[in-house]
């Protein structure tokens, strides 16, 4: 770390011993203040800079478990303060996907510069991205201490939030929303349940958990497994009664037998995951050019090489080298002793996180919905966590005295048409605290495709009222009705530069923390300072050891034996890397010269360029139909090992 940081750290260390005497600050946070996390500059970012904080918070002192966060302050305040905690899936995939490819204020360009994301979720909400479980992304832990169960992960997140709100108390009373996608369909309900339980404990300041948002979520494994064949038929990937279909249906029978033999409560079942793997393998067109052989499991409109989606999304080719740049690592306050580069998904984390003792979140989601408003959303072109599985799950769930979207016995809430700026955007359906949104012509990562539409969804769900701040609302209608003015129209991202006066007030509040007790407790401070120096030095040595211990697994990720989800797309690439023994940083060159994706990747980059919905919502495009239709002949079987 640059020498300019030495003075603040020395000052922090002197205060460390004194601050540990404060009841709200645990020993793991001794010596840390907001100033240590403040991002003074960010390479490639446009001016003026957004207000951001980033760094590590310790959640497991015994095993040196630290979670990395990146926080953006909201650019405008509507009627109330809100914070959105965003989590990506995997398990073991970094939430920097969400920060730099989906809902965050910046997108990374090919030249390494950042540009504003027109549609970022920080318009009216503070955004908090966390790499979790420990070991994911920039987070770290001793390599013999990866988590294995969902309850462990949820407990770490509660510890993280306790300490984070201790550092940033001005956000503790915000309305809190937890959002994410994919395997976060397990993470989010588990974390929400832990927060609800914590809020009921005596002496705790309740956190205002106001809502959950889960996109293309892995919530009900059974419903997802049994959705693969219907989805393949509905979208022309496979023809009923074909030899291909018979082989895949045989795999489904094996899956059902496994489920009936005790697999109904498993978070992942390998024999059932094989259904999708077999469909992808059977539908490969090996006569096509290399980058157009396989359907992309994350967006069936696209095709990829034999990995069936691991080269997607295309922005990853720019994000990975950006997050490995030394100046970016320094700006984000990453421990300088960390020798391995950022990885989107960590196979060591997912390999340990088998959740064998955990029940699927669908088992208790019906108990959460009455307490916490919940929104599920699906991109209709995603295969791996497709909308059919989500809809089956909703239909089968019972909560608040009804089943599915019943409003009265036997009468279901209507599915409403949603239009955005004159285009058919999707459908809305809601009843008894649950909302379900389908995005037409969208992938596994809906905000990657439609950032502004997802922000409109978020603002509607949060009940944002922009009338107090002015601005022109976007033309968003549900069944033709505009409803409340909830989302601003199309404009480049503004910044909080003009609102720095409020920031100055907050900084003044923290100066008061530093001065607190300095006159009355001078002697205590001096004595405690010596102890703080000792802790500071020993912690630096301890951290260095932990990072070095983590090297063995970074960049050498074996084929997964269970649930893949976001990790699945990198199985083949990681098995190739496992045979090589070289420094992780050499991967920068590999990613910079990565293979070009197949048909459709470049043409789907702009929200305004998406094709509008028509009567054949769930059909493939012309090219994909032809390729899928020609693959009914005998194919080599394969799958994950």
Swiss-Prot record:
GO cellular component, one term: membrane
Record flagged with keyword Glycoprotein: yes
Biological process according to GO: apoptotic process; proteolysis
MF (Gene Ontology): serine-type carboxypeptidase activity
Glycosylation: residue positions: 118, 433, 441, 493
Superkingdom assignment: Eukaryota
PANTHER family: PHEROMONE-PROCESSING CARBOXYPEPTIDASE KEX1, SERINE PROTEASE FAMILY S10 SERINE CARBOXYPEPTIDASE
Protein name from the UniProt record: Pheromone-processing carboxypeptidase KEX1
Originating organism: Leptosphaeria maculans (strain JN3 / isolate v23.1.3 / race Av1-4-5-6-7-8)
Organism classification: Eukaryota, Fungi, Dikarya, Ascomycota, Pezizomycotina
Gene expressing this chain: KEX1
């Amino acid at each position: 770390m640059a020498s300019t940081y030495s003075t603040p750290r020395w000052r922090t260390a002197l205060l460390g011993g004194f601050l540990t005497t404060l009841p709200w600050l645990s020993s793991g946070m001794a010596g840390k203040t907001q100033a240590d996390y403040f991002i003074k500059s960010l390479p490639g970012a446009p001016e003026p800079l957004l207000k951001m904080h980033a760094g590590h918070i310790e959640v497991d002192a015994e095993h040196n478990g630290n979670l990395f966060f990146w926080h953006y302050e909201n650019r405008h305040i509507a009627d109330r303060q809100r914070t959105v905690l965003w989590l990506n899936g995997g398990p073991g995939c970094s939430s920097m996907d969400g920060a730099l490819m989906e809902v965050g204020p910046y997108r990374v360009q090919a030249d390494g510069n950042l540009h504003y994301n027109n549609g970022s979720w920080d318009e009216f909400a503070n955004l908090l991205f966390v790499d979790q479980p420990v070991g994911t992304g920039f987070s770290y832990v001793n390599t013999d201490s990866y988590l294995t169960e969902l309850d462990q992960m949820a407990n770490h997140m509660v510890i993280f939030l306790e300490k984070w709100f201790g550092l940033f108390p001005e956000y503790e009373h915000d309305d809190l929303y937890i959002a994410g996608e994919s395997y976060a369909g397990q993470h989010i309900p588990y974390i929400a349940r832990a927060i609800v339980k914590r809020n009921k404990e005596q002496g705790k300041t309740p956190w205002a958990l106001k809502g959950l948002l889960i996109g293309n979520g892995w919530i009900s494994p059974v419903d997802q497994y049994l959705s693969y064949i219907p989805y393949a038929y509905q979208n022309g990937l496979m023809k009923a009664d074909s030899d291909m279909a018979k082989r895949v249906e045989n795999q489904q029978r094996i899956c059902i037998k496994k489920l009936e033999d005790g697999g109904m409560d498993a978070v992942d079942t390998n024999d059932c995951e094989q259904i999708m793997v077999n469909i992808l393998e059977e539908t490969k067109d090996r006569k096509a050019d290399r980058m157009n052989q396989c359907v992309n499991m994350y967006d069936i409109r696209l095709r990829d090489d034999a990995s069936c989606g691991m080269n997607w999304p295309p922005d990853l080719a720019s994000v990975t080298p950006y997050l490995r740049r030394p100046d970016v690592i320094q700006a984000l306050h990453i421990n300088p002793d960390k020798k391995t580069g950022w990885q989107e998904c960590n196979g060591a984390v997912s390999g340990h996180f088998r959740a064998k003792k955990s029940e699927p979140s669908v088992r208790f989601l019906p108990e959460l919905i009455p307490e916490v408003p919940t929104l599920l959303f699906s991109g209709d072109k995603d295969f791996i966590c497709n909308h059919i599985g989500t809809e089956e799950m909703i239909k089968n769930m019972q909560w608040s005295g009804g089943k599915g979207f019943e409003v009265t016995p036997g009468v279901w809430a209507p599915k409403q048409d949603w239009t955005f700026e004159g285009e058919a955007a999707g459908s809305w359906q809601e009843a008894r605290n649950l909302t379900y949104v389908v995005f037409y012509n969208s992938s596994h990562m809906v905000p990657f495709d439609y950032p502004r539409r997802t922000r409109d969804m978020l603002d509607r769900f949060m009940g944002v009222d922009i009338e107090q701040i002015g601005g022109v609302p976007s033309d968003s209608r549900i069944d033709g009705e505009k409803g409340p003015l909830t989302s601003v129209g199309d404009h480049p991202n503004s910044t909080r530069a003009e609102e720095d006066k409020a920031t100055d007030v907050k900084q003044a509040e923290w100066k008061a923390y530093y001065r607190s007790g300095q006159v009355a407790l001078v002697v205590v401070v001096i004595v405690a300072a010596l102890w703080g120096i000792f802790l500071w030095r020993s912690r630096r040595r301890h951290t260095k050891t932990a990072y070095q211990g983590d090297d063995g697994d970074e960049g050498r990720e074996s084929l997964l034996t269970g649930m893949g989800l976001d990790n699945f797309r990198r199985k083949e690439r990681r098995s190739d890397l496992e045979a090589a023994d070289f420094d992780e940083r050499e991967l920068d060159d590999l990613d910079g010269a990565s293979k070009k994706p197949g048909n459709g990747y470049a043409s789907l980059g702009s929200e305004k360029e998406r094709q509008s919905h028509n009567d054949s919502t769930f059909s493939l495009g012309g090219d994909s139909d032809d390729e899928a239709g020609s693959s009914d002949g005998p194919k080599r079987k394969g799958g994950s090992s």
